[in-house]
Amino acid sequence: IYRTTVSRMIKQAKDEGIVKIEIQEFNTQIYALERHMKSKYKLKDIEIVPVVESDSNEKKNQKLSKAAAAYIKRKIEMDSIVGVSWGETLGDTVAEIESKKKTNAMFVPIAGGPSHINSKYHVNTLVYEMARKFSGQNIFVNATVIQETPQLKKGIMDSKYFKELKDYWERLDIAIVGIGGPLRIRESQWRDLLTKEDYKDLELREAVGDCCCRFFDHEGKMLKGNLYERTIGLDLYHLKKVPLSVGIARSKVKSKSILAMLKKSYINCLITDEETVLEILRLEKDPYLDTYQLKEI
């Protein structure tokens, strides 16, 4: 192969956003931590963003979004079927993606929408933006994630228009999800759809978080019941079967919910940061912490 041909190929790859040449310091401590987590929780992939003590929460979130965007860009291939959940973390991640890849991938919602229809984090906005950035296709969901009754939810799920979406759920290659934290975090764009009775029931059953708008306890057990039956979204057992299920989340307050997801292997790829992983290991009383040098926190 001629040198000029290689040069042209590299230039084209850079232009399409496939290749980015950067010189970065290799963090051996983070690498070792990733290997430990990957082995402990049987993960296909993990990306741990280093933390600097002076970083604000906003800066930490931005670093996470950039790392997640870079990972997703690498993983989406020609004709991939990609399921997308929604929320602030995923919205920020999608905003960070810069891609000129032409993939013809299909991007589909895996949960109903929030109550605030104009939200920039609405799942329909996210699948549209992903399809635009990867020169792919998308379909929308035209129902809020929580319905008033199980009968209403069943009617929507059984409808002709919803069949196409459910068919794609059965063929997902990749799922990209956020992970919600404790019940006390109520400023979410969909938790206002929950009733007082929903909150009371979830508190009694010790919910620690949610994913795809499905609540679970500290062991990762899905909390089934009236709320579950009113929820439009992929259930976590289904998420577990997706070849690449990517969870994107950070913060100590979410560590219990992330740990629960890992215990049940609902996700096989985690993108998070250093302080979150260390908090997870503290919750697990993992001896690995005894050997870890807290250089940057």
Where are each of the predicted segments found?
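ATP/nucleoside-binding phosphotransfer catalytic cores, i.e., glycine-rich phosphate-binding loops
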Residues: 31-32, 218, 222-297
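Gly/Ser/Thr-rich active-site loops/lids in small-molecule metabolic enzymes
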Residues: 188-218, 269
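Short coil turns linking two alpha-helices in DNA-binding domains
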Residues: 1-2
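Ligand-binding beta-strand-loop-alpha-helix segment within the catalytic cores
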Residues: 35, 40-80, 102-183, 190-192, ...
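Short Lys/Arg-enriched helix C-cap and helix-to-coil transition segments
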Residues: 17-32
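Key DNA-contacting residues within the recognition helix of helix-turn-helix
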Residues: 7-10
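Gly/Ser/Thr-rich loops at beta-strand to alpha-helix junctions
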Residues: 82-92, 181-183, 251-253
